[in-house]
């Protein structure tokens, strides 16, 4: 019968929830019992029930509702009761004084009389003692009969009540509690002694007792009884006359029934459906702890199961079950639709079955607590769904199931891929659960309803039945075999009967051990024994293939479904993983308490097949068996997941643990380690860290990648990379480090990515991770053990490298010894360093340079260490023998530190370290030796020290020379003045050295001589300014003082002097020192007052340039332009513009100045001015304006014509004159002479057309009168004859920039549109193949022309400098700079 889900209402807070209903086991009604109320009592410690029927029959039912036996006493049945063992049922019958004692085992019936004095006394109630085989009977005469069934002794207790005994009970202490309708209550011993008695105010009913813990933890028996249906009386069993009467709210109604529970608490049910919980403890007696309305119609009865920890109630045609620890929650609700008037509910001692009866005589038996019985195979599970029904879920994640109806109640189950095995006692039944008929039935059912809603129920027939020698305790199956544990034996046999029917039992007789545990996989039977063995029995070989002896017995094993590893728990309470391949044992990381581990389950999903979980009663601990880990096969702890109460894990698939609950049903728990987060953007950093850690532990790289991309946290990327490396996934590690930009790690990993050898690859990874000891071990186990030595060498771990070299490559020992010796030398271990240096020396018969260098290093080390260890003679001798200077210096330093100055000086001198040698000799007071070395000494300090020594010895000239060499000018001047009396030399030294102290000495010397001008100068140099000024003022030598301040003074001194001159009205000098002091406005204002003085104007320009003050300079420009009515020399304005970096303005001014000189006919002056401006701009890295450059070219072209004519370069001169005539406006005072010369020279150069042109120009009325008589007739003839003549074609030469041909005298290229520099010697544009520059002014020209003029001893036409240093140069570099300059 399936479970129904019924909506239930909790009346206290009107919360609606869902709970399951109890399963109906069977129901018997009026047909069996007759019509009317019945009495039913569960047999103690069992699941059978006795029913006193309305038809006066006592029926004894088994667990399935079958009648075991029946008894038909004569008369109406009024009460029945079981003895404490459940062997004898006492039956009370009305209208007769006989009590029937029915032995249900032997089926015999005895009788006992209920009358105390006569047979007319009729029984009214009876009860058995819970501790002895004693029956107590109450009768209608108020008497009590005590009957011991074992001894057949009968005791009549009379006079306890005056009227009929209505209820009787016996406590565990054998006190008889009885009540009567005479309103009395009595406690009596079995011998009839009255313990306590009392009279109540109403009729006592529902009498009971309970135990309440008193002081010290001892239990006190309390008697409870309902008085008049309203009051619950509580009293101590020996003090009934001191009761506590409890009354309750009127709304509850009358007390219907109540039950004691949990040591001193009472549940009371009222007829109006209310149930309350109160306490009987002294400090809270009567306190209502919980109250709720259970039924709205009526409440019929309540029962309490302490083993089940439940409250069971009936009413309103329902059965409700609540947890005693949480009474506000209904855990089970069952509707009884067939009956309307329920009367009584009773539960078995184990809480598994509940009997509910009605007024009409119907008895319903419900299953409220199924036996928690289940088994699993990979991800298939079978579990008990009814006492004789087993549900098989073939694949848990597919939600499909089928239920097999059995003929027995199984106590043990086993599940395989195709079969189910169930056992009861020593018999095992095997079933198929994947038969075609079952599958067809399941498909038909699923076409109409979901398999999840109702499983397929099949009446199964066993395919095999096997009996064993003792009770079966465990069954395990695979495809073909069954392994059954009975007693201390294990039998392995086929599931189905076959012809060979092979079977074998373990442990074998010769093993002399008992079975501890076992497990069955597809390929192996694995079992453990008391003598510590784990044994693998191969099913294919049918033989034992592996035996491993552990240190202690293994109490349980849980094998991997497909691999040869298993999880084991041993008697030391340790958990481990055992691998049968190599007998390796990996202990599980310490998590939780291994003493409480209950079992282990392996992941059945292929991707996570190396994951397994160990569980206790509270948690599931997830581990990973890592086979690719760099440390080898190992167990990694992943995480823990809380296990709900009373959940027993059965299988693990895709991170979901399927568990058996305490109610016999299945439930699932998702492991925290397998929880995946589809959205991580809203997660906290802590949660993201946790998810990343789980993903890395489970090797879920894709999830880890998404997390790291989201967080973009360097620590997350590094954690990811380390996990990948430790798992030998170099490719993933490269991807990670490339993502975070770690080029060094990417490069390092790419070098090892292609390594296929496992040990070598892992060693390289360990090296990268700085785990060098592990790396060395793996290198040595790899095919390239020398890598271990190389690694130690790279790490400078010389002792370890030497150990490796001794066995692997002894030839490396000298080299390693040398390195180790150097390290020991640095750490101060000189003795061991010496020993290693000596080991490092190698024979070199062939004088190989490499070995020679190596030996020199070792021998140098030997020399040093010999000295440091006290063997001075050996060390010094060896140092002198070695060729190098360094060893001599090093050994000498050591000797010097040891105060062995003589030996140190010798080595310094031999090593040509003269300064050090002299210094050591000074320490040794070897003055003569210092004198010998002094010519080689460069240290000023040594010279000064030696000079002081010579001075003491009055060798002043030698001392002066030493002071000069040591640059101790103060002492040198002192000796030169006195005692050597050489003031001229002293003055020279002071002027060159700028020595302040020396200047003071010289000043004092000149004061003594009366040379105040010199004294003032040297006083200023020595910063004795005030003294110098007073001396100057006193001796009318302020001008000399001013000169000294100008050269050596600071700002404050210059300012004081300026104010002095201002006071004496010397404006120029005041302005000069204001300028030096930075007081530019004061200086300018004074200079403007003397604007006619050229010196003042020049100083004003200097002041403006220094100030960099825009306002002041604008004011100065206006002043220079004649704002005061007096225009100043434009050259000063030009100088100002140049100094201020105003290139354009400076160029314009220069052109203007040049034009002024041109207008006066001073062409060379104009040219020189423009050239000077050109050079200044170039020196200041300033742009040279095109106009200025063009003016300079035009004037310079005219000036060099005379020189060309003198050199007979007529054509060149003519071409330049043509250029000059093109710029004739630049030569206003010499127009006629220039035109005349042009006519003459062009005629000579056969440039007839140009000559005619210029001659015609002279014939104009403006110029004709000014023509010289000598040339007038000739010019007239040229004009008359000319007109059709032509000039010689101008030569084309390549452009130095683009190499395109252009006219030789053109200054711009039509092709590249570039300005081309001109030759300062010929006026033609330069060419790249014949380029040079003047060595002095660096102006360009033809190298051939420079060379020609140099041979003629002529100078540069531009600057007048010597041309002998001109050399061919690269025109391209010059042109690139010119392009920048002439923009």
Swiss-Prot record:
Phenotype seen when the gene is deleted: Defects in cilium morphology and mislocalization of intraflagellar transport proteins. Specifically, phasmid cilia are shorter compared to wild-type, ciliary IFT A complex proteins such as che-11, osm-5 are mislocalized, and the transport and accumulation of the ciliary IFT B complex protein che-13 is impaired. Mutants also display a strong osmosensory (osm) phenotype with an aversion to high osmolarity, and they exhibit impaired chemotaxis in response to volatile odorants such as pyrazine and iso-amyl alcohol.
Domain of life of the organism encoding this protein: Eukaryota
Tissue: Expressed in ciliated sensory neurons.
Coiled-coil region list: none
GO cellular component: cilium; intraciliary transport particle A; intraciliary transport particle B; non-motile cilium
Keywords from the UniProt entry: Cell projection, Cilium, Cilium biogenesis/degradation, Protein transport, Repeat, TPR repeat, Transport, WD repeat
GO terms under biological process: chemosensory behavior; chemotaxis; cilium assembly; intraciliary retrograde transport; intraciliary transport; non-motile cilium assembly; olfactory behavior; protein localization
Subcellular locations according to the entry: Cell projection, Cilium
Name the record gives this protein: WD repeat-containing protein dyf-2
Organism annotation: Caenorhabditis elegans
């Amino acid at each position: 019968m399936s479970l129904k889900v019924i909506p239930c209402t909790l009346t206290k807070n009107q919360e609606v929830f869902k709970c399951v209903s109890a399963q109906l086991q069977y129901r018997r009604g009026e047909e069996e019992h007759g019509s009317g109320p019945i009495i039913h009592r569960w047999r103690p410690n069992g699941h059978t029930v006795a029913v006193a029927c309305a038809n006066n029959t006592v029926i004894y039912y088994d667990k399935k509702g079958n009648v075991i036996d029946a008894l038909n006493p004569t008369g109406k049945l009024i009460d029945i009761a079981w003895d404490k063992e459940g062997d004898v049922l006492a039956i009370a019958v009305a209208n007769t004084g006989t009590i029937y004692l029915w032995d249900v085992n032997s089926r015999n019936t005895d009788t006992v009389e209920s009358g105390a004095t006569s047979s007319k006394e009729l029984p009214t109630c009876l009860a058995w003692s819970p501790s002895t085989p004693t029956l107590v009977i109450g009768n209608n005469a108020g008497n009590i009969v005590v009957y011991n069934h074992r001894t057949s002794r009968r005791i009549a207790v009379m006079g306890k009540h005056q009227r009929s005994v209505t209820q009787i009970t016996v406590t565990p202490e054998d006190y008889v509690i009885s009540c009567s309708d005479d309103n009395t209550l009595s406690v009596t011993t079995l011998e009839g002694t009255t313990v306590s008695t009392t009279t109540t105010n109403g009729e006592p009913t529902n009498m009971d007792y309970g135990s309440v813990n008193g002081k010290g933890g001892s239990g006190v028996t309390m008697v409870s009884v309902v008085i008049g249906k309203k009051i619950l009386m509580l009293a101590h069993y020996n003090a009934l006359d001191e009761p506590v009467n409890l009354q309750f709210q009127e709304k509850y109604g009358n007390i219907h029934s109540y039950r004691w529970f949990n040591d001193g608490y009472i549940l009371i049910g009222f007829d109006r459906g209310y149930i309350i919980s109160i306490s009987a403890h002294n400090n809270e007696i009567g306190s209502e702890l919980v109250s709720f309305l259970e039924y709205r119609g009526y409440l019929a009865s309540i029962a309490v199961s302490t083993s089940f920890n439940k409250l069971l109630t009936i009413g309103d045609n329902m059965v409700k079950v609540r947890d005693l620890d949480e009474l506000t929650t209904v855990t089970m609700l069952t509707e009884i639709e067939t009956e309307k008037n329920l009367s009584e509910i009773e539960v078995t001692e184990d809480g598994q079955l509940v009997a509910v009866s009605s007024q009409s005589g119907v008895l319903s038996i419900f299953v409220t607590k199924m036996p928690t019985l289940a088994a699993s195979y990979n991800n298939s599970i079978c579990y008990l769904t009814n006492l004789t029904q087993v549900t098989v879920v073939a694949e848990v994640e597919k939600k499909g199931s089928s239920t097999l109806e059995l003929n027995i109640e199984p106590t043990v189950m086993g599940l395989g891929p195709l079969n189910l095995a169930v056992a009861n006692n020593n018999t095992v039944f095997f079933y198929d659960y994947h038969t075609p008929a079952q599958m067809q039935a399941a498909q038909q059912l699923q076409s109409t309803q979901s398999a999840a809603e109702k499983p397929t129920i099949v009446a199964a027939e066993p395919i095999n039945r096997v009996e064993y020698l003792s009770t079966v305790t465990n069954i395990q199956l695979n495809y073909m075999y069954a392994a059954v544990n009975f007693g201390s034996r294990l039998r392995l046999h086929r599931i189905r009967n076959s012809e060979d029917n092979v079977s074998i039992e373990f442990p074998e007789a010769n093993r002399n051990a008992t079975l501890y545990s076992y497990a069955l996989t597809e390929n192996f039977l694995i079992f453990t024994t008391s003598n510590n063995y784990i044994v693998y029995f191969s099913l294919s070989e049918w033989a034992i293939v592996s035996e491993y002896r552990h240190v202690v017995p293994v109490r349980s094993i849980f094998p991997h479904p497909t691999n040869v590893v298993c999880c084991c728990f041993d008697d030391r309470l340790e958990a481990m993983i055992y691998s049968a391949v190599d007998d390796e044992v990996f202990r599980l990381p310490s998590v939780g308490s291994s003493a409480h581990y209950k079992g282990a389950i392996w992941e059945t999903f292929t991707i996570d097949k190396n994951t397994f979980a160990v569980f206790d009663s509270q948690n599931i601990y997830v581990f990973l068996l890592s086979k690719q880990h760099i440390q080898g096969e190992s167990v990694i702890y992943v995480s823990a997941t809380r296990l709900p109460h009373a959940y027993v894990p059965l299988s693990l698939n895709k991170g979901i643990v399927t568990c058996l609950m305490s109610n016999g049903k299945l439930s699932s728990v998702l492991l925290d380690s397998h929880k995946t987060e589809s959205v991580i953007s809203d997660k906290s950093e802590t949660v993201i860290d946790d998810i990343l850690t789980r993903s890395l532990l489970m090797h879920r790289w894709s999830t880890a990648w998404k997390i790291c991309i989201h967080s973009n946290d360097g620590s997350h990327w590094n954690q990811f990379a380390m996990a990948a490396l430790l798992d030998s996934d170099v490719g993933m590690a490269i991807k990670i480090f490339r993502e975070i930009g770690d080029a060094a790690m990417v490069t390092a990993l790419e070098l090892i990515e292609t390594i296929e050898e496992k040990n070598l690859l892992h060693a390289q990874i360990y090296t990268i991770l700085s785990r060098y000891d592990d790396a060395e071990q793996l290198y040595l186990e790899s095919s390239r053990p020398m890598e271990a030595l190389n690694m130690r060498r790279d790490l400078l771990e010389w002792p370890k490298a030497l150990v490796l070299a001794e066995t692997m490559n002894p030839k490396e020992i000298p080299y390693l010894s040398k390195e180790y010796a150097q390290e020991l030398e640095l750490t101060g271990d000189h003795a061991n360093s010496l020993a290693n240096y000596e080991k490092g020396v190698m024979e070199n018969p062939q004088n190989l340079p490499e070995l020679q260098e190596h030996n020199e290093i070792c021998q140098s080390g030997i020399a040093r260490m010999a000295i440091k260890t006290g063997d001075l003679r050996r060390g010094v001798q060896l140092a002198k023998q070695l060729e190098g200077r360094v060893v001599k210096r090093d050994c000498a330093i050591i000797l010097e530190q040891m105060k062995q100055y003589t030996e140190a000086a010798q080595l310094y001198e031999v090593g040509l370290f003269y300064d050090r040698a002299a210094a050591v000799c000074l320490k040794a007071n070897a003055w003569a030796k210092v004198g010998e070395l002094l010519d080689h000494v460069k240290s000023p300090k040594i010279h000064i020290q030696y000079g002081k020594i010579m001075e003491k010895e009055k060798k002043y000239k030698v001392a002066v020379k030493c002071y000069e060499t040591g640059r101790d000018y103060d002492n040198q001047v002192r000796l030169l003045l006195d005692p050597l009396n050489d003031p001229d030399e002293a003055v020279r030294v002071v002027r060159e050295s700028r020595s302040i102290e020396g200047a003071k000495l010289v000043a004092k010397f000149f004061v003594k001589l009366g040379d105040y001008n010199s004294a003032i100068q040297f006083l200023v140099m020595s910063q004795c300014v005030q003294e110098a000024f007073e001396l100057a003022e006193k001796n009318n030598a302020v001008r000399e003082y001013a000169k000294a301040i100008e050269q050596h003074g600071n700002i404050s001194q210059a300012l004081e002097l300026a104010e002095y001159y201002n006071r004496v009205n010397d404006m120029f000098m005041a302005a000069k020192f204001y300028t030096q002091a930075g007081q530019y406005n004061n200086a300018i204002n004074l200079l403007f007052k003397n604007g006619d003085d050229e010196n003042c104007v020049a100083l004003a320009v200097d002041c403006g340039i220094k100030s960099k003050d825009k306002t002041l300079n604008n004011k100065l420009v206006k002043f220079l332009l004649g704002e005061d009515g007096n225009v100043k020399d434009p050259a000063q304005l030009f100088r100002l513009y140049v100094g201020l970096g105003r290139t354009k303005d400076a160029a314009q001014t220069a052109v203007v100045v040049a034009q002024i000189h041109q207008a006066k006919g001073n062409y060379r002056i104009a040219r020189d001015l423009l050239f000077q401006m050109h050079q200044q701009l170039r020196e200041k890295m300033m742009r040279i304006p095109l106009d200025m450059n063009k003016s300079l070219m035009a004037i310079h072209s005219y000036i060099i014509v005379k020189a060309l004519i003198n050199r007979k370069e007529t054509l060149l001169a003519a071409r330049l004159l043509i250029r000059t005539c093109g710029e004739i406006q630049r030569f206003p005072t010499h127009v006629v002479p220039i035109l005349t010369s042009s006519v003459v020279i062009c005629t000579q150069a056969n440039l007839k057309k140009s000559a005619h042109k210029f001659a015609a120009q002279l014939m104009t009325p403006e110029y004709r009168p000014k023509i010289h008589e000598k040339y007038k007739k000739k010019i007239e003839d040229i004009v008359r004859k000319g007109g059709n003549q032509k000039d010689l074609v101008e030569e084309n030469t390549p452009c130095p920039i683009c190499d395109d041909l252009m006219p030789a005298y053109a200054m711009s290229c039509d092709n590249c549109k570039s300005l081309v520099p001109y030759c300062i010697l010929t006026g033609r544009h330069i060419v790249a193949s014949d380029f040079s520059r003047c060595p002095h002014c660096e102006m360009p020209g033809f190298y051939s022309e420079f060379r020609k003029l140099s041979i003629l001893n002529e100078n540069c036409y531009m600057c007048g400098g010597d041309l002998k240093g001109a050399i061919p140069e690269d025109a391209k570099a010059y042109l690139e700079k010119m392009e920048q300059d002439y923009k």
